[in-house]
Amino acid sequence: MINLAEYLLREFKEDTPEKSIKFFRSHGGFGYVIWLTILLKYFKKEALPIEDLVLSAEKYASRRTVVDFINKSSEGGYLLKIISNIDRRKVFIEPTSLTISEYSYWAAKFIDNVK
């Protein structure tokens, strides 16, 4: 338990070189919730409509703030917005390959350090 607490504290205080992780963590709790929600849905192979993502983070920031953050994430190359072929009004969110690879590296490092 001490290893976990020490690692989390050190990892939180240190500046990470991974651009996507730095971006999501720099926006407080809602950025972290958005990051983990997107990755969880991606690895579960479940579609994530933008509206569901907004609702998952509204507890931590205003709707406008969350929508702006999602737009910045997309513009920054960390998220993909995919328009539905069936209903053009529906937009889905997926992580980019950069976000996936940096998360995978971060997760492996995390697991190694808490053993």
Identify the role of each PLM range.
Residues 6-37:
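Short alpha-helical segments that sit at the start of domains
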Residues 74-84:
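A short, conserved structural fragment
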Residues 44-57:
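Short acidic, hydrophobic short linear motifs in intrinsically disordered regions
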Residues 60-75:
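Short amphipathic alpha-helical interaction segments
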Residues 32, 36-43, 58:
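Short, locally clustered residues in the helix-turn-helix/winged-helix DNA-binding domain
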Residues 98-115:
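Short, amphipathic alpha-helical interaction segments positioned at domain boundaries
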Residues 83-92:
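Short, Lys/Arg-rich nucleic-acid/phosphate-binding segment
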